[in-house]
């Protein structure tokens, strides 16, 4: 898919250990001249961890994308009626978020963005970041 001139939502959930690598991918995406709207789950938006300060990640995303972070269900809800995204990328997508998506639960900014975007029949790309043992059920 040629991304120049396309509008892309880039949603991040709480797999904090992957944030530095994911932000590098956002930079690559920005280099394609796509118009990027960052979306962060409430947890990703507000939680400081050993991998970095939330405010630093938010600031960096806004600088790269040139748009404010969508960070609430109310803000994400607008994606549906306006149908302004051509593509929604969820990276990293935690196992918890994946389970919510699979069951139609839209109680966070990211899951609501996905629901609203899918309403328009447009593609969602999910990059799962979770422990493989969680996915296959091994203890």
Residue ranges and their predicted role:
Residues 1-139:
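A cross-family phosphate/adenosyl-ligand binding-site feature
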């Amino acid at each position: 898919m040629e991304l120049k001139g396309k509008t892309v939502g880039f949603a991040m959930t709480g797999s904090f250990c992957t944030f530095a690598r994911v932000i590098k991918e956002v930079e690559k995406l920005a280099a394609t001249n796509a118009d990027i709207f960052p979306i962060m789950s409430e947890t990703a938006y507000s939680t400081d961890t050993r991998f970095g300060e939330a405010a630093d990640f938010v600031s960096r995303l806004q600088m790269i994308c040139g748009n404010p972070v969508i960070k609430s269900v109310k803000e994400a809800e607008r994606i549906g009626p306006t149908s302004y995204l051509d593509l929604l990328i969820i990276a990293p997508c935690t196992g918890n978020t994946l389970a919510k998506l699979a069951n139609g639960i839209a109680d966070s900014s990211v899951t609501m963005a996905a629901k609203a975007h899918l309403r328009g029949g447009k593609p969602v790309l999910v990059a799962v970041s979770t422990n493989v043992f969680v996915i296959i059920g091994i203890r």
